[in-house]
Amino acid sequence: MEEVINGILIREVETKNIMTKSSLPVGGYSVNPYVGCTHACKYCYASFMKRFTGHKEEWGTFLDVKHWPEIKNPKKYAGQRLVIGSVTDGYNPQEEQFGNTRKLLEQLIGSDADILICTKSDLVVRDIDLLKKLGRVTVSWSINTLDENFKNDMDSASSIEHRIAAMKQVYEAGIRTVCFVSPVFPGITDFEAIFERVKDQCDLFWLENLNLRGGFKKTIMDYIAGKYPELVPLYDEIYNKHNRSYFEALEVKAEKMAQKYDCAFVDNEMPYGRVPQGHPVIVDYFYHEEIRGTENTGKRNR
């Protein structure tokens, strides 16, 4: 089937396996119920997927709805990390119609897998009933600003306030949550202000730098020149001259924040577990491509 719904080209496609071995530092498997993402984030690294899928359409204007063989032996993934939404958002607006992510979660019940859901949506609250049944599950929301105008310039996903409200609801349901401050835009993202808003409703507070490469580098640099001309010299230093001092200073700032609030400060994620409310683990995910290993066992290669 192929049709255009609200300006988005929708295709239904068959796939042999919904699981893909992951090369991410968190390891395990990438699980993407869709190809493409209609949030249309201007900085989305996943836009590179078009090279492999053959899509000619602009990123954010298409969505492939996957159909896969039912997972009949979920125990096969016991103890494995499953990242749902590594190159899509399983809770894109079209999930309300197609329900792929809910179907996936239903098939994973009893797996005893370590499941990480990455999203920018508040639709995840619909599935709290399933999340409770899955046991070791973590839900992560990307929040890199409290400014709705900047957010709207960057993506068409749920508002920041809706994401924060969803995080609170999921956290209070007893499910581990992450505030993923990603990407940190130099001179724009105020991660301390975000921390103040979410520290009582998240277990982990991840920090990741804005990494500009490929086609979206020009998009972002042009945006900065047009909206934040005073930041052009800083972006030139970081992204053309490869000066790392800005993010190195942010690492120091983040570690001091961790000390102030009595929070653990680590280079990578801690093993699954909850932490005392108000003391989330602060994860230094800057330049994460240098981290090898998982669960804070990896070392940085500088």
Residue ranges and their predicted role:
Residues 109, 171-172, 199, 259:
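Anion (oxyanion) recognition and catalysis
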Residues 2-14, 192-302:
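Auxiliary Fe-S-binding modules of radical SAM enzymes
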Residues 120, 142, 266-270:
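Conserved beta-strand termini and adjacent loop/short-helix elements that scaffold enzyme active sites
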Residues 133-139, 199-204:
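Glycine-enriched alpha-helix->loop->beta-strand junction motifs that scaffold or abut catalytic
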Residues 156, 168-189, 240-244:
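Conserved strand-turn element in the central/C-terminal portion of the radical SAM core barrel
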Residues 29, 82, 115, 139-141, ...:
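Hydrophobic faces of well-ordered beta-strands that scaffold small-molecule active sites
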Residues 83-92, 122-125, 137-157, 186, ...:
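Conserved radical SAM core fold
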Residues 1-138, 146-149, 160-161, 165, ...:
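Conserved Radical SAM active-site core
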